Amino acid sequence: MEVDCENCAGCCVDWRALADVPDHERRGPQAPIDDTYNLVPLTRDDVRAFLDAGLGDALTPRLWAADPDSPSVAVDGREVAAIREKPAFFVGIRKPPKPVAPFDTEGAWLPTCAFLDPETLQCRIHDDPEYPEECAEYPGHNLALGVETECERVEEHVGGDRLLDDEPPAEQSSLLFGPQAVGQKVFAYPDPGDLPAGLVDRLAVGDLTDEDRARFVAVAAASAPGTTAVEPTKREQAYETVLDTDSWVGRAIEEWTDRVGEDAPDPGLGEAVEDSRGAPGTPGWD
């Protein structure tokens, strides 16, 4: 497997507005309630690594609208996909609007991974312990399953050569499906009646509160592989950890959200918004 990532970041940026690509990227058969593009599912170990690194405020949940014939549970009067009558979800990385210019385009405000340097279009945590397993191996799992990669979508709609070698890596982590994924990549919220009013609506419009996100991140961190069980003490500790987190990521997301529409989309703003708050640097391209 070989890819050309320079000046791309198609897997990290919601670039649909640049190429008139209206369809929503989907992972699995059910439609996500949110509209976040290419939200990468984190494993339980990934989630714990982010919490250990003091980056819990970078994480957000995804829930799915239930199909008529699929298991579901009512939350806020809406049927959401469920596992044993518990809302099913995974955890990904938040995508605030950032000024980016992929594919040699003019700068634009686009939803972008919280850890992507808007100027170099490189990941700020690429060599860190919390770098997600799925990101490290992308697009290996897609190639192994014969599923279209984001590299190929960019080639089709923008042009250029991004996927240079489509042979799946000989060694990569095991794919998690069905029961294998429960408690490890797909989680079950144990007490849906405890969810605050309006949560599903806030999720749909991308306006979750810190408390909303912390509830789900804590459940993921306290889950056990292969089961819907959640360890109460670990859950409470993780919840408090997320709420107490005040990282450069969370502060930068707040400023990006305030700046969108007010400032010209200059990728160089990343220095003032992220680097000045302690964001790790990126090497640039040789």
Which residues does each PLM region occupy?
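Short loop/turn segments that flank or connect secondary-structure elements
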Residues: 1-286
